[in-house]
């Protein structure tokens, strides 16, 4: 490819609405352009990298005996209603009606579609196992699209679905996909960790997320420094933190004017946060749910949802919902409260091990002091569960070792679905005895476009992107200092041909721009190798090869360039 033929409009300034480094650099380097909020068009450089990621995914999926198919993006509402997810999926699902007023959605995922497809074709155990996958666009109506490709409304995803006769078969399929994902992300050059996770709206009995470690990640993960334990903080298992036992003091009310946060109360009463309890109120499945944790802890929304067996993600309760169940925002505790059909109380396990703590008095500008939960809560009428987020002070639930925290970008997830969809959609097969059984399913997703963004978040500097060789749009760029110099251009063309013949994916920058402009673009776009051809190098019958990752510049004889470049690329 010649640069004069390449459509790659670069920008010198950082776009004002670009939130994270990957978004900034993809816009500046001419990889994509914003179409609307959460929607992007890929330009040639970006699409080349996307296709390289897809090629790696296809090779490893095929190696794992998965077979590629393609299903419609547009899905009928009927199959989602049959599975029970039409309403449960919530506002993130993009729904449309055709001219006949039939309901459809733009697929956020394809469990219903693939199950409906397979159940009409497979009827015997002899036809199982089978694993089918596709790579296509998915759609989610994000409330706040942001971070470029990491939280967009349309994104490219590989989704695979396995069907087995029993749990042992599912375990084998799951391990096969887990191993394939490990190979895929290693080949893409990512630093990542598989972590235990929550299955969310997709459901199932077990799941792992593949997290690319990056400060820009939206997910918080914990991992053990001694063993292989790693988990999304939403599913991390906190221990019970016990306080030293104290003599129980008399419960009393104190005035706390305008102190509607637990931090303000602690400051006003000169209390450490761990001697307070705080309330967070959610709306889940139409029920108001009061969650109570220690003042120095944070509520785990996923754990609260599980504690009340909620089918939809928690949302913050509205003032109207608080009023309906008689709660006063900023001054709430379980003291004197009882659960009803419309109101649930969930208390963290560590709260139940506190003594003489402070919490809301359930009236404006007042708090209780000397709350003792085992005495003052209606313990037979509350749910006690581990609903706090794990902290740096917790220990590994597996081996007792120290835990480290990190930010991660979810680039893939594998699920053990079991019979959640096959039972709902009646996808059965006849076993060896002629009896019908539901197929045992797994599903496996990779965010292809998100993987691209994650790689940039991990590999960049102040000058631009530093691509892993495997997913770079071009592996090398040849930069003649002066495109008007026939000798330089002739040598550059010779090197270009030699590299192409050696199988190197190479770009020749034949633009007549100044050398400084070409160098800046090369660093911004992030080609792994830059081959500079100048009068000075030609005097010694050499060129200069610069490694983008290290900045190291190496002289190389012209007739050895193809060999040297191939050798260098093996280590990038």
Over which residues does each language-model region extend?
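C-terminal structured "cap/appendage" subdomains that terminate the fold
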Residues: 496-556, 560-561
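TRNA-binding/sensing appendages of the translation machinery
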Residues: 1-98, 110, 161-200, 297
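Charged, low-complexity intrinsically disordered tails and linkers
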Residues: 1-28, 114-145, 256-260, 458-462
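C-terminal, non-catalytic macromolecule-binding modules
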Residues: 265, 442-471, 475
């Amino acid at each position: 490819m010649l640069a004069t033929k390449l459509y790659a409009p670069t920008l010198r300034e950082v776009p004002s609405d670009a939130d994270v480094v990957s978004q900034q650099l993809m816009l500046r380097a001419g990889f994509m352009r914003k179409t609307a909020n959460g929607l992007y068009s890929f330009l040639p450089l970006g699409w080349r990298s996307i296709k390289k990621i897809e090629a790696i995914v296809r090779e490893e999926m095929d190696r794992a005996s998965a077979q590629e198919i393609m299903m419609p993006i547009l899905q009928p509402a009927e199959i989602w209603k049959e599975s029970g997810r039409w309403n449960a999926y919530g506002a993130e699902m993009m729904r449309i009606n055709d001219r006949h007023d039939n309901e459809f959605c733009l697929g956020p995922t394809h469990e219903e579609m693939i199950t409906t497809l397979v159940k009409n074709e497979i009827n015997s155990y002899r036809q199982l196992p089978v694993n089918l996958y596709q790579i296509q666009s998915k759609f989610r109506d994000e409330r706040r699209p942001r971070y470029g490709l990491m939280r967009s409304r349309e994104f490219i995803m590989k989704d695979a679905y396995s069907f087995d006769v029993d749990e042992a078969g599912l375990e084998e399929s799951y391990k096969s996909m887990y191993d394939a994902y490990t190979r895929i992300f290693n080949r893409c050059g990512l630093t990542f960790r598989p972590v235990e996770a929550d299955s969310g709206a997709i459901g199932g009995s077990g799941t792992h997320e593949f997290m690319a470690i990056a400060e820009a990640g939206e997910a918080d993960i914990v991992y053990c420094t001694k063993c292989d334990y790693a988990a999304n903080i939403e599913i991390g298992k906190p221990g019970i933190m016990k306080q030293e036992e104290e003599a129980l003091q008399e419960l009393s009310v104190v005035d706390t004017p305008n102190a509607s946060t637990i931090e303000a109360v602690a400051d006003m009463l000169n209390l450490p946060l761990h001697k307070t309890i705080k309330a967070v109120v959610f709306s889940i499945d139409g029920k108001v749910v009061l969650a109570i944790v220690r003042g120095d802890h944070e509520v785990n929304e996923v754990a609260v949802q599980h504690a009340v067996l909620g089918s939809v993600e928690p949302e913050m309760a509205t003032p109207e919902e608080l009023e309906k169940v008689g709660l006063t925002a900023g001054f709430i505790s379980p003291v004197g409260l009882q659960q009803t059909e419309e109101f649930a109380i969930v208390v963290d396990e560590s709260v139940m091990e506190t003594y003489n703590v402070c919490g809301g008095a359930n009236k404006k500008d007042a708090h209780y002091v000397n709350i003792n939960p085992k005495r003052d809560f209606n313990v037979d009428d509350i749910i006690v569960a581990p609903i706090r987020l794990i902290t740096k002070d917790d220990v590994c639930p597996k081996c007792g070792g120290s835990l480290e925290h990190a930010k991660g970008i979810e680039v893939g997830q594998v699920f053990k679905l079991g019979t959640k969809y096959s039972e709902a959609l009646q996808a059965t097969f006849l076993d060896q005895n002629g009896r019908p059984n539901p197929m045992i399913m797994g599903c496996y997703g990779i965010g292809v476009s998100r993987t691209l963004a994650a790689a940039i978040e991990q590999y960049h500097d102040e000058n631009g992107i530093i691509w892993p060789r495997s997913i770079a749009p071009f592996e090398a760029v040849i930069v003649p200092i002066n495109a008007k110099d026939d000798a330089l251009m002739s040598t550059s063309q010779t090197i270009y041909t030699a590299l192409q013949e050696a199988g190197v994916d190479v770009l020749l920058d034949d633009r007549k721009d100044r050398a400084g402009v070409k160098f800046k673009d090369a660093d911004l776009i992030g080609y792994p190798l830059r081959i500079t051809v100048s009068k000075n190098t030609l005097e010694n019958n050499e060129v200069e090869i610069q490694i983008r990752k290290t900045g190291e510049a190496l002289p190389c004889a012209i007739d050895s360039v193809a060999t040297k470049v191939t050798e260098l690329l093996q280590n990038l």
